Structure formats: C-alpha cells, structure tokens
C-alpha cells in the first residue's frame, strides 16, 4: 500500500547545499517525490507545525531555527513511506542515535540542526501535509 509522508529539508540542509544529496537518497530508497517546494516559513506555520513542543524550553530556539532561512518541503510517497524515510534520516540525535549511512549520521552534529524532518506516523503525515500543502489530498 502506498503511503505519504512529509519531509522537510531544514534551513541547515539548504544552506549546506545538501538538498540534492538528500533527495537522491530518498529516490534511491525507491520513494517518489509527489510535491516539492522551496519555502520561507512564517512564524505562524512554524508554531502550528511544532505545536506539541510549545511548552518545552527549546520551543523558542526551534522556531528561530526553522524560520532562519528557506527550507524544502516535500510530499514523499511509497510503500511504508513514513518508516522508510525515518530509516534513511537516522536518529534525531545525530551523534548518539544516528548511525553512519543515514542522512543525520553522515552530515549532522547537533540535535536541533539535524538537517531533516520526517513525519512520525501516517496520522502525523496527514496533518503535516495538510498544513504544508493545503489542498493536497492525503490519500
């Protein structure tokens, strides 16, 4: 069954010119890019996206980071797309959890500046796709 997930290549990935490398890894895994946009993120969109972190001490720095420059937002499709992308992304902590061979394991050092975001469940993917790509069907 085909599944959809939201992938963000965060401002650090864009600034470091890793967009092509990251998209290539997604496609080499067998996933398909269904939509792709370079965006400057508004404070409102950032707050909605990270709403579950609103009461955490790092929320302000997270908003500052995600709005610090352009990012790439993509809808990625394929069998088990959510789990497949999270596998190639690697653990959230790029040093302690992400293994070499993953995007974060190969290119990131800091937890917040960890290059990519991927939805953590099909339900989150549907919510996030609706937020980042209004009007897109989430089938």
UniProtKB/Swiss-Prot annotation:
CDD domains noted in UniProt: NDPk_I (cd04413)
Catalytic activity field: a 2'-deoxyribonucleoside 5'-diphosphate + ATP = a 2'-deoxyribonucleoside 5'-triphosphate + ADP; a ribonucleoside 5'-diphosphate + ATP = a ribonucleoside 5'-triphosphate + ADP
Active-site residues per Swiss-Prot or TrEMBL entry: 117
GO biological process: CTP biosynthetic process; GTP biosynthetic process; UTP biosynthetic process
InterPro entries linked to this entry: NDK-like_dom, NDK-like_dom_sf, Nucleoside_diP_kinase, Nucleoside_diP_kinase_AS
KW Nucleotide-binding (keyword) present: yes
Quaternary data: Homotetramer.
Function noted in UniProt: Major role in the synthesis of nucleoside triphosphates other than ATP. The ATP gamma phosphate is transferred to the NDP beta phosphate via a ping-pong mechanism, using a phosphorylated active-site intermediate.
Name of protein: Nucleoside diphosphate kinase
Gene that specifies this protein: ndk
């Amino acid at each position: 069954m085909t599944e959809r997930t939201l992938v963000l290549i965060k401002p650090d990935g864009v600034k470091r010119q890793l967009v092509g490398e990251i998209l290539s890894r997604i496609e080499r895994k067998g996933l398909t890019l269904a939509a792709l946009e370079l965006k400057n993120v508004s404070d409102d969109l950032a707050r909605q996206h990270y709403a579950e972190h609103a009461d955490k001490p790092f929320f302000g720095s997270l908003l500052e980071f995600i709005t610090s420059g352009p990012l790439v937002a993509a809808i990625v499709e394929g069998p088990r797309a959510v789990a497949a992308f999270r596998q190639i992304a690697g653990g959230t902590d790029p040093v302690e959890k992400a293994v070499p061979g993953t995007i974060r394991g190969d290119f990131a050092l800091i937890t917040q500046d960890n290059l990519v975001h991927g939805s953590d469940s099909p339900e989150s993917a549907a919510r996030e796709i609706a937020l980042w790509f209004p009007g897109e069907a989430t089938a």
